[in-house]
């Protein structure tokens, strides 16, 4: 009878910090504001663009039932956009200023969706389009305590859209909501799905931080509300039409970082960094040849490595939290992974959560074997044995089938929140623990 032989070994892993560079910022959230990084002393600025979508069965009441009218034409009583936010970094009471710009056309250029790109500002803002400036605080000081105490309260930045609006055809409306209502009743098919809405009615809006500093917030939902009245059975009722910036439509964040300040951290060798948004990644060189040497015909059952956090000694009241999730991806695959909307497969891409003061990848043996085979077959790139640790956010979907449920990953995105962690490594190699097996 064959006997299973188990062996273990460990190997050094070299790590270093690298500049994140220009990363794909398409995400399910937007980020807005300006904040001074306590680690670098430099400012991070975040602006974002969003489109708006509708449900497939979107419809409005019969035009004849609308009470809100002017000279026989349907009008909106009012219109506003609300930026619903959470995950505030910095001083929530800091006075901030934003400017909202209407887009002239839907964003279609993939290059415009990267953090360093100014293409949206240079190529997509409508000249003479709808613009609104707004002062705000992320403490939501304009909402009274009674409303904040309500169960369904969610803080938001409220942007009025009630001034006259002139569309691209030169037609002027009472407000932006009136434009939407009259467009709907003249051609309801333009509101039949998000694609037609974006291409024919609302290309999108860009929200730019133009004043103040001290905070950045995560905008997890952007909703446009159109308020009007209808008459039914002799009574008048208030009604709302809403259009949402959700994960089904395009959202992207533009980031301004101080690259020189980031480079000073990259040059440190006392550890490595992960900094978001679009700041610093950690690169690992895996000792593939050493791991496989003498075990070419053995099974590699597991290869485990932990990236341990160096505790933050900052005394700043706004010390940054560590990224919640990180992706391990081959260095030569990082650009295509995000551009092609791939998700982790736990064969050559892995996600780990921040837990017990670090990130643990329990088994990357399939990646080790794949790298070795690529080199052996002559298909390896110059970075064949290098991986990059990238802070990410993920989305998932749960499907219920009777008493059973299954959860599936639906998206992996570059983390655009303001987070930072210093990890063991650099001058001090990490250890990867390997378990082999073979039959004798």
Where are these regions (language model features)?
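Secreted, disulfide-rich extracellular signaling modules
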Residues: 1-440
């Amino acid at each position: 009878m064959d006997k299973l032989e188990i062996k273990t070994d460990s190997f050094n892993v070299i790590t270093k910090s690298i500049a994140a560079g220009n990363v794909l910022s398409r995400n399910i959230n937007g980020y807005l504001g300006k904040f001074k990084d306590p680690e670098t002393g430099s400012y991070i600025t975040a602006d974002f663009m969003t489109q708006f979508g509708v449900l497939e069965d979107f419809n409005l009441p019969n035009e004849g039932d609308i009470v809100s009218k002017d000279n026989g034409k349907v009008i909106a009583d009012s219109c506003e956009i609300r930026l619903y936010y959470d995950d505030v970094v910095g001083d929530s009471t800091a006075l901030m200023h934003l400017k909202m710009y209407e887009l002239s056309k839907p964003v279609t250029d993939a290059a415009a969706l990267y953090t360093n790109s100014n293409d949206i500002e240079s190529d997509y803002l409508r000249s003479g389009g709808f613009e609104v400036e707004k002062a705000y605080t992320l403490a939501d000081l304009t909402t009274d305590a009674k409303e904040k105490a309500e169960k369904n309260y969610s803080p938001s930045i409220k942007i009025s859209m009630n001034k006259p609006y002139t569309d691209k055809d030169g037609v002027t409306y009472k407000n932006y909501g009136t434009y939407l209502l009259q467009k709907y009743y003249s051609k309801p098919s333009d509101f039949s799905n998000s694609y037609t809405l974006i291409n024919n009615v609302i290309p999108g809006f860009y929200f730019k931080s133009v004043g103040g500093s001290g905070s950045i917030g995560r905008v997890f939902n952007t909703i446009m509300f159109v308020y009007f009245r209808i008459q039914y059975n002799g009574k008048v009722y208030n009604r709302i039409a809403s259009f949402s910036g959700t994960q089904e439509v395009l959202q992207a964040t533009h980031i301004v970082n101080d690259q020189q300040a980031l480079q000073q951290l990259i040059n440190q060798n006392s550890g490595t960094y992960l900094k978001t948004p679009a700041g610093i990644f950690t690169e690992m060189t895996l000792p593939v040849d050493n791991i496989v040497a003498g075990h070419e015909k053995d099974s590699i059952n597991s290869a485990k490595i932990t990236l341990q956090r160096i505790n933050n000694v900052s005394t700043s009241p706004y010390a940054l939290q560590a990224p919640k999730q990180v992706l391990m991806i081959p260095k030569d695959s990082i650009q295509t992974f995000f551009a092609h909307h791939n998700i982790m497969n736990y064969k050559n891409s892995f996600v780990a959560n921040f837990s017990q003061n670090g990130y643990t990848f329990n088994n990357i043996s399939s990646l080790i074997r794949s790298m070795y085979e690529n080199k052996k077959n002559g298909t390896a790139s110059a970075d064949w044995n290098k991986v990059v640790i990238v802070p990410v956010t993920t989305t998932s979907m749960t499907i219920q089938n009777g008493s059973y449920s299954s959860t599936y990953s639906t998206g992996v995105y570059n983390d655009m929140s303001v987070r930072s962690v210093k990890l063991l490594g650099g001058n001090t190699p990490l250890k990867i623990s390997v378990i082999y097996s073979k039959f004798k």
